[in-house]
Structure formats: structure tokens, C-alpha cells
Amino acid sequence: MPDRTLSLEGIYNLRDVGGYPTTDGQHVRWRRLLRSGRLHALSPSSQQALHDHGLRTIIDLRRPFELTLHPNAFAASEGITYLNLPLFDDIGAETVDAPAQTLAEVYIRYIELCQPQLSTVLSAIAEVSDAPLLVHCAVGKDRTGLVIALTLSALGVAPHIIADDYALSYAHLAPLFDAERPSIPPERRDRFERMIRSPREAMEQTLASINQRYGSVANYLETLGIGATKIERLRANLLE
């Protein structure tokens, strides 16, 4: 079995989501769908490694100010299709990022307030048919985690497996916390550490809430305009 974790200099939380079984006996293809944090610090050798891995499309979910602060290393690369598809803009972030009690509440806010953007992102994933695709945000946990969860749901991966995949982020982001810790004011360290946590129950609660509100994840996807045709395209491209 291929290694799920791809360890490259200058990037955190880079993982292949291949290998997961679906409820109908298929599996997510390896080397088709990757997830990660931001790419601005990739070394030249790491950029070449991703090229050699076959990467041809990048979907960057970050906001405009994030792009200014940390430009994407592949934004102008030849042979790479770069799509900046933010889940919300700098203004909308004030509503989406308003204080919440739990991570699940944050994700449900995304589910409710970012429907046009989620539709665009999932439609773009469905269009990539023949080479690895990388979805990323800042640390590859929240925005990326939700997009990957909805994609895996569309493919027929069971909720508990989706929650397990989401939960892997914390172990991959702990080195980021260790690296940044000296520069973080002591009074903000607990908040930063909480930001990189990825408890599996947060994704379990999110998927359960979608089921409660919409009847099923499939119904929610239909609300987004991700109907049978796009689902079949996703399955054809990403399953074996």
C-alpha cells in the first residue's frame, strides 16, 4: 500500500486520500486526490517532487489577503493548473469566522453560508480526470477538511472513515506548532494549539448535522447542484 503521508520540505499536512473503501466495494484511487496546508514555503526540490508525483491541478481555498501574505508557489508554474477558489472572501470571513463553541459549529456555518463556493469547488474536482489534484488552504484542516469530507461522502466512503481521515491532521500539524512556538506570544499559544486540533468527533458531528438538516449528504450535495451526473464523474475519476 502506498504511503498516505508525503513528507516534503516546506509543507505541512500533505496527504494522499487514496485507498479508502466505499460502501459498494470500490476504493479511492491513490495518486489522484491530495490535501495539504499552504505551499508558499516549498523548496525547489519539493516543488519538483510534486511535479514528478504527477501533480497537475491545484485548488487553493484561501482568501485574498492570505494569497498576498503567502503566495502560492505554483500560481504561475508551467504545466500546473492553479485555481484560487476561496470558500469566502475577506468580507464574508467576518460572518463565517464569528465566534463558535465547537469546530462542528464552524463547519456547519461553512455548510450553510458557503454553498455557492462549495458547489464551485466540488464541480472543479469533478472535472479533473487524469492526474493528481491537490486541495489546500492554510493548514489543510478546516476548509480543506470539509471539502475532502464532502468529496469522500460523494464517493461513498463511510462517515467513520471520513472522520478518521480528518483526525489525521493534528499529528501532521504538531510539528508546525513546535516550529512556530518560539515566535508565538505566550498568551496566544493555547489558542494556536487549539486551532490545529482535529478531533474526529468534530467531523462526525458535522456529517450528522448535515444528515439531520438535509436528510443525507447526497441531498445536501443536490442542493449545491452536485447531482447524479457530477457524482458519477467524481466516481469515474477517483474510484477503482
Whereabouts are the PLM-identified features?
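Cys-dependent protein tyrosine phosphatase-like superfamily
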Residues: 1-134, 146-240
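Ser/Thr-glycine-rich phosphate-binding loops at phosphate-binding pockets of nucleotides
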Residues: 139, 143-144
